[in-house]
Curated annotation (Swiss-Prot):
It comes from Clostridioides difficile (Peptoclostridium difficile). It catalyses: glycyl-[protein] + reduced [flavodoxin] + S-adenosyl-L-methionine = glycin-2-yl radical-[protein] + semiquinone [flavodoxin] + 5'-deoxyadenosine + L-methionine + H(+). This is 4-hydroxyphenylacetate decarboxylase activating enzyme. Belongs to the organic radical-activating enzymes family. Keywords: 4Fe-4S, Iron, Iron-sulfur, Metal-binding, Oxidoreductase, S-adenosyl-L-methionine. NCBIfam families: HPDL_rSAM_activ, PFLE_PFLC. The keyword Chaperone does not apply. PROSITE patterns: 4FE4S_FER_2, RADICAL_ACTIVATING, RADICAL_SAM. Binds 2 [4Fe-4S] clusters. One cluster is coordinated with 3 cysteines and an exchangeable S-adenosyl-L-methionine. The gene is hpdA.
Length: 316
């Protein structure tokens, strides 16, 4: 009799020796899929669960006469200009399931943004890395939004706790109450993002309203969950750094007895990924957040009795 097939999850990266994603030295697992579409997103390749392709012009050897991908795309998504440079029709490419261009490329110019793992395969990676953590570390599930693959994640979490692996999550909390509560039963530490307190402004820049997000955070804060919760705010000048929004965040935290927040200054490190996905990056001209302004925001939280960490300087 054949054994039951294991659940598979789609993962776009696994990083060992992460020191900014929770207490101690950790393995961070990046799961595909996200209900948000933040205009500043550093990991836009994570938005869909299904595999899709990225193209790096810097890795492509078209200028050296390489033609290995010519004629490989049977769907007509791939053509070439007079300089031999690949030209991609992303409207066709997004529905591809065969990825002949990826399979043909010697130089990783075409690459997939998702790799399937079974539960046991991923747990084996985590257990292997646990030799590096010893008692100080664990695994952090990030994304994308890891809760979108909640059935797979739940099975992995159960196996992690069987071998006493500390579990953390980085989440938008933008999932149903049922899914959120089920997963958090097996979470020891959490970063949860608050992009903006105003629901309309939140939707304008992320594609979704924030009602469900705030509801899940409130429910968690007022439950008997005994893990550690740190809110995170990606600080973006002109979007969510106003006195009004900061005051609203503080009021929300006081109302729910939340005591820790992490301010992450905006960066453009993911811009090249947008180009590789054929997407327009609207934040290319957005300036960095002034360090002095970040210190002012930090002082406001501290003056209101909230532990506030800036960037990767956290109390771990």
């Amino acid at each position: 009799m054949s054994s039951q097939k294991q659940l598979e999850g789609m993962i776009f990266d696994v990083q060992s020796f992460s020191v900014h994603d929770g207490p101690g030295c950790r393995t961070t697992v990046f799961l595909n899929g996200c209900p948000l579409s933040c205009k500043w997103c550093a990991n836009p390749e994570s938005w869909t669960v299904r595999p899709h392709m990225m193209f790096s012009e810097l890795s492509c050897q078209y200028e050296n006469g390489c033609t290995v991908c010519h004629g490989k795309c049977k769907n007509g998504a791939l053509s070439f200009n007079l300089d031999n440079k690949p030209v991609i029709d992303w409207n066709i490419c997004k529905d591809c399931e065969s990825f002949e261009c990826v399979n043909s490329c010697y130089y990783n110019a075409f690459k997939l943004c998702a790799k399937p793992y079974t539960v046991d395969e991923l747990v084996q990676v985590i257990k292997r890395d646990s030799n590096n953590w010893r008692s100080n570390g664990g695994v952090t599930f990030s994304g994308g939004e890891p809760l979108l693959q909640h059935e797979f994640l739940h099975e992995v979490l159960l196996k992690c706790h069987e071998v006493n692996v500390h579990t953390a999550i980085e989440t938008s909390a933008c999932v149903s109450n049922e899914v959120f509560n089920k997963i958090f039963n097996d979470i020891d530490f959490a970063f949860i993002d608050i992009k903006h307190m105003d629901r309309e402004k939140h939707k304008e820049q992320t594609g979704v309203y924030n009602d469900l997000i705030l509801e899940n955070i409130s429910n968690l804060a007022n439950s008997d969950w005994n893990g550690r919760l740190v809110l995170r705010v990606p600080v973006i000048s002109g979007f969510n750094d106003s006195d009004e929004n900061i005051s609203d965040i503080i009021s929300f935290m006081h109302k729910n007895n939340l005591v820790e927040i992490n301010l992450l200054p905006f960066h453009r490190l993911g811009e090249s990924k947008w180009t590789q996905l054929g997407k327009e990056y609207e934040y290319s001209d957005k300036g960095d957040v002034d360090e002095g302004h970040l210190e002012e925001l930090q002082d406001i939280f501290l003056d209101n009795g909230i532990a506030c960490y800036v960037g990767h300087v956290t109390a771990f």
